[in-house]
């Protein structure tokens, strides 16, 4: 997973960093810069998707074999602003054979980002569907 992320020039160009990892999980962080802001003054959804997709890629590649996205979607819940530090936490939901499903929560971590309960404000929810590039033999037990 580390080699994949080190070779990921798109994520590096945006300052995305891997801050935590485990089997089927990954946490990435990114600061929203002025170049990431859309015409409404909020973080462009494409950058939020890219952050979530990077965490997804790290989580689904944490098992070793090369794994790619088969599809993904995102729901934007709240805006993020220039200067916000965003955290994307990816969690494996299920994996069988060559397929997997991962959920990623993107939250604001910048000062003032907490909701009334004092917790990080969710900005977006992402679901990724993965496909391992190596074949699975018929009759193998689920992973």
Language-model region placement:
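A generic structural signal for short beta-strands and their flanking turns/coil linkers
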Residues: 12-14, 24-26, 66-72, 84-86, ...
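Short, charged/polar surface micro-motifs in flexible loops or helix N-caps
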Residues: 23-24, 33-36, 54-56, 82
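A short, polar/proline- and glycine-enriched secondary-structure boundary/capping micro-motif
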Residues: 38-41, 135-136
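Hydrophobic beta-strand-centered segment that forms part of the acyl-chain substrate-binding groove
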Residues: 57-87, 92
């Amino acid at each position: 997973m580390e080699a994949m992320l080190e070779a990921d020039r798109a994520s590096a160009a945006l300052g995305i960093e891997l801050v935590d990892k485990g089997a089927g999980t990954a946490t990435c962080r990114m600061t929203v810069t002025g170049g990431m802001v859309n015409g409404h003054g909020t973080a462009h959804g494409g950058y939020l998707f890219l952050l979530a997709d990077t965490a997804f890629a790290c989580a689904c590649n944490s098992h070793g074999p090369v794994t790619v996205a088969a599809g993904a979607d995102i729901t934007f819940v709240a805006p993020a602003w220039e200067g916000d530090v965003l955290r994307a936490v990816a969690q494996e939901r299920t994996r069988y054979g060559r397929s997997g499903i991962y959920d990623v929560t993107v939250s604001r971590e910048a000062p003032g980002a907490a909701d009334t309960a004092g917790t990080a404000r969710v900005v977006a929810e992402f679901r990724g569907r993965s496909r391992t590039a190596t074949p699975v033999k018929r009759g193998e037990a689920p992973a």
